[in-house]
């Protein structure tokens, strides 16, 4: 089964994807992670991607697809998280899957009001040494632990990220709606409740 997780930053896509990976054996493909890993390892594709990133440019679609092909499992269930972001990427992904005799089964759109996203993200704090993520309201850091707020998590930056997300993703939502595979998840609910909705969509995950 192939799933695509769509939704604004702070919708909890990563949390749900990690849980499905752990409990149902899905392979979680996060393009952010595979890009960082390829760049760190200095693979040929990673070196190419790094050139674009250093210039502050978007990594081209064909390069991202090539990176995905490298980590795509021979068989099993897969979640794409943070990809595709555009219709062009969705078409490229469909083409890649078709060659393997596969297709996207469900696209889960994690819907959450802006004010919830802003509260979730602007409260996030990170321990720069361990990468551990905390939240001032929901999961405060233990006393004495030094934490920082990422630039990305400042309210004015979050608003901009939400605007960009909307512009980019609206056509993509239409694309998957037309295919009849778009499923809406109410991501403003507590984590457990969101997970229950995800399981309802995918059945037992086979």
From Swiss-Prot:
Its EC number is 2.7.4.3. Its main location: cytoplasm. Residues 123-153 are annotated as: LID. It catalyses: AMP + ATP = 2 ADP. It comes from Aquifex aeolicus (strain VF5). GO terms for biological process: AMP salvage; nucleoside diphosphate metabolic process; nucleoside monophosphate metabolic process. GO terms for cellular component: cytoplasm; cytosol. This is Adenylate kinase. Belongs to the adenylate kinase family. Transmembrane segments: none annotated. The lineage of its organism: Bacteria, Pseudomonadati, Aquificota, Aquificia, Aquificales. InterPro entries: Adenyl_kin_sub, Adenylat/UMP-CMP_kin, Adenylat_kinase_CS, ADK_active_lid_dom_sf, P-loop_NTPase. Keywords: ATP-binding, Cytoplasm, Kinase, Nucleotide biosynthesis, Nucleotide-binding, Transferase.
């Amino acid at each position: 089964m192939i799933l695509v997780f769509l939704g604004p930053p702070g919708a909890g896509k990563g949390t749900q994807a990690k849980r499905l990976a752990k409990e149902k054996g899905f392979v979680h493909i996060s393009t952010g992670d595979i890009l960082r890993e390829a760049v760190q390892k200095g693979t040929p594709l990673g070196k190419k991607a790094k050139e674009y990133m250093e210039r502050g440019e978007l990594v081209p679609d064909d390069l991202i697809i090539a990176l995905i092909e490298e980590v795509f499992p021979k068989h099993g269930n897969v979640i794409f998280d943070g990809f595709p972001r555009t219709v062009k990427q969705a078409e490229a992904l469909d083409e890649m899957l078709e060659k393997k005799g596969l297709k996207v089964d469900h696209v889960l759109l994690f819907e959450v009001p802006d004010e919830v996203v802003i509260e979730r993200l602007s409260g996030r704090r990170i321990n720069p040494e361990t990468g551990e993520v905390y939240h001032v309201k929901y999961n405060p850091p233990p006393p004495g632990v030094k934490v920082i707020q990422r630039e990305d998590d400042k309210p004015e930056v979050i608003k901009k990220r939400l605007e960009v997300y909307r512009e980019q993703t609206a056509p993509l939502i239409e694309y998957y709606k037309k295919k009849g595979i778009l499923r809406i998840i109410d991501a403003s609910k507590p984590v457990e409740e969101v997970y229950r909705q995800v399981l309802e969509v995918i059945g037992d995950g086979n």
